[in-house]
Amino acid sequence: MALPAPRMLDPRSVPALRWGIIGPGSIADTFVGAIHRHTTQRAVATASRTAGQADAFAKTHGLERVHESYEALVADPEVDAIYVATHISDHLTYARMAVDAGKHVLVEKPLSYSASDAEEFFAHATAAGVLAMEAMWTRYLPVSDVYRQLVEAGEIGTPEFFQANFANDNRHIERLWTPASGGIVHDMGIYPIAFAQFVMGNPSAIHATGRVTAEGMDAESYVTLEYDYGSRSLLYISGTATVPCTATISTSTNMVTFDHPFFVPTGLSVSNKDLYFTGEHWADTTAVQGHDGLSYQASYFAQYVSEGRTDSPLHSHADTVGNLRVAEAICEQIGAYPSGQ
């Protein structure tokens, strides 16, 4: 089987939006660096609640303006779109602020702790006529399009079983273990949850066991998802153990394996189902590697703005809400309450 080349958007073909950055921390640093290296998108302004942080960020990335407040940032007439990269607990507060100022908004994943809050926010943004998009960047990567083409061409059969791991010993990253961060399921686990949805759709049943910390934060989860059509997914999510972060699909005719780590620009193999997994491998050999892959979503975002869209066809509002319902169910079943409830 010859594996297809990805159908990717030329970043030079879309409008160069002027971006305002809310939450100029580490993930925003990665995002802005990536879009400046690989796209025509430009961050032009920022603000921060932490003294000096916005000034340092602006100096690093060559931003034109630093505002004294987030309210002033979203009101800036020379900003077209807002990128929200604060703690999860603040995502919707600032996303709503951007929408109410008439700005399109890209919000870091996960959008919220709460599926119902996300649903309400998306309805508000749609009514306002602006694009609101969760930054589930994996959906926009070349490897994801290679998989889409295989599905569209009927090359790999019907998915029967999906397995994915995101397990990395992150006990040293303090923010992952606080309610403001959302916990391991919401911060790390949202990747395998969303990838399962990408491949299998939304589940009809969710079964989870796991471990929580003395403070009630989730540390490790073992998740089985069942689907109305009889297939199932198995997810392992951990902030204490380290295993390869791969994703594998067993179909009626083949096995598809996404390389480690499956959520960045990487490769995939399509194999037969014998013991030795004979088949073909596709590798992403572009210059956009690692977390520079965050840049792809920005180009698609700009394209959707130019088309007048209020939702992303590759990762819809309904997709975000469905994934948050799974994350909520996992936390409830293992006794973790990352929102502090």
Region roles according to the model:
Residues 285-299, 315:
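Active-site loop of classical SDR/Rossmann-like NAD(P)-dependent oxidoreductases
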Residues 67, 107-108, 132-134, 163, ...:
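Hydrophobic residues in well-ordered beta-strands that form the structural core
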Residues 2-7, 194-266, 293, 299-309, ...:
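Contiguous beta-strand/loop segments that form the cofactor/metal-binding neighborhood of enzyme cores
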Residues 120-138, 157-164:
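Rossmann-fold dehydrogenase core element
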